[in-house]
A protein has these predicted regions:
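Oxyanion-binding "anion nests"
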Residues: 192-239
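N-terminal Rossmann-like NAD(P) cofactor-binding subdomain of oxidoreductases
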Residues: 1-191, 227-228, 261, 279, ...
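Glycine-rich beta-alpha junction loops
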Residues: 39-41, 129-130, 154-161, 195-203, ...
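Generic solvent-exposed, charged/amphipathic alpha-helical segments
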Residues: 20, 215-219, 260, 264
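Helix-loop-beta segment of a Rossmann-like dinucleotide-binding subdomain
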Residues: 118-125, 194-205, 309-311
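A glycine-rich, Thr/Ser-enriched phosphate-binding loop motif common to dinucleotide/cofactor-binding enzymes
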Residues: 122-133, 206-215, 319-323
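C-terminal active-site/capping subdomain that shapes the small-molecule cofactor and substrate pocket
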Residues: 227-334
Length: 334
């Protein structure tokens, strides 16, 4: 099998580290790994398949000879280096939001729209974490009845805000236990024993940027340009794995049993739906997994053509790193 030179842009961050871990787990054909980060991290090493690999400073020349670049950096870094990556002849699989809504850039969840990889022009975007988890859960239903609208409430883990999120939660819990105060640095308010119903800045009619991603990205991934989504995104004091409560509205009546049968066989999905025996998806059970768990399927009591469901998924893996590497796997199959 052909071996590929793979660069990880943002190799020292949580998603970048997870990408390298998953490359090894999935036996991706890496001939050479090129970890890239800021100048202050250059010269340090990361582990890959038991070997120490030296981190290089991210610069335009670092992409020469690279086949695939996995992006785990912020928007500004992605925008800065994208031209050099494309010029070098590499394919940039980018986890930032910089190019997601660009009509010339595919936005891909491999279980849903793998065919879109064929029209890339050097850049492929990885969707937002909560969007990936949600659309992976509902897309199978769209194959038996067209989804017209969705409402969603997300319960997003602190690690979704970066490595500092879990540290801040732990520090706040400890400070409260000791009767001390702790000034939040990562979140706008105390997250311990609290919920923060705001992720991202205001973007449209009181909706945040994170909330609008569910509609705008969902439309592009599922090829449903008229899809309407109303979403509320909430940060919760959970370390890892996002959860989403979703109401889905179809162009016809869909029974609970129909939905269960379809979801039972859906790629990337595990059905966990047995309320009498207290079997349903929970963040603790879905962490460090590469699939989306779906349960609590029931009729919507307001709209005749609606279903409600609950899904959970690891936002660092399927919501980011694993999805990006699945995209890279599509590239090497071409």
């Amino acid at each position: 099998m052909k071996q590929y030179t793979v660069a990880v842009l943002g190799a020292t961050g949580a998603v970048g580290q997870e990408m390298m871990k998953i490359l090894a787990e999935r036996n991706f054909p890496v001939g050479k790994l090129v970890p890239l980060a800021s100048a202050r991290s250059a010269g340090k090493t990361v582990k890959f398949k038991g070997q120490d690999v030296t981190i290089q400073e991210a610069c335009d020349s670092a992409f020469e000879g690279v086949d695939i670049v996995l992006g785990a950096a912020e928007n500004d870094i992605a925008k800065k280096f994208a031209p050099a990556i494309v010029k070098a002849g590499a394919v940039f699989v980018d986890n930032s939001s910089a190019f997601r809504l660009d009509p010339n850039v595919p936005l891909i969840v491999p279980e849903i729209n793998p065919e879109d990889v064929k029209w890339h022009k050097g850049i492929i975007s990885n969707p937002n974490c909560s969007t990936i988890i949600t659309v992976t859960a509902v897309n199978a239903l769209n194959k038996i009845a067209t989804i017209q609208a969705m409402t969603a409430s997300t319960y997003q883990a602190v690690s979704g805000a970066g490595a500092g999120g879990p540290i801040e939660l732990q520090n706040e819990v400890e400070a409260l236990r000791l009767g001390k105060t702790y000034e939040p640095k990562v979140f706008s308010y105390q997250i311990a024993y609290n919920l923060i119903p705001q992720i991202g800045g205001e973007q449209f009619e009181g909706y945040t940027s994170e909330e609008m991603k569910m509609q705008n990205e969902g439309r592009k991934i599922m090829h449903l340009p008229e899809l309407k989504v109303s979403c509320t995104c909430v940060r919760v004091p959970v370390v890892r794995s996002h959860s989403i409560s979703v109401s889905v509205y179809f162009d016809r009546h869909v029974t609970v049993e129909e939905a269960r049968q379809v979801l039972k066989d859906a790629p990337g999905v595990k059905l966990v739906d047995d309320l009498p025996n207290l079997k349903f998806p929970m963040p603790l059970d879905t962490s460090d997994q590469d699939i989306v768990f779906v349960g609590r399927i029931r009729p919507d009591l307001v709209f005749d053509n609606g279903l409600r469901l609950w899904c959970c998924g690891d936002q660092v893996r399927k919501g980011a790193a694993t999805n990006a590497i699945q995209i890279a796997e599509l590239l090497v199959k071409e």
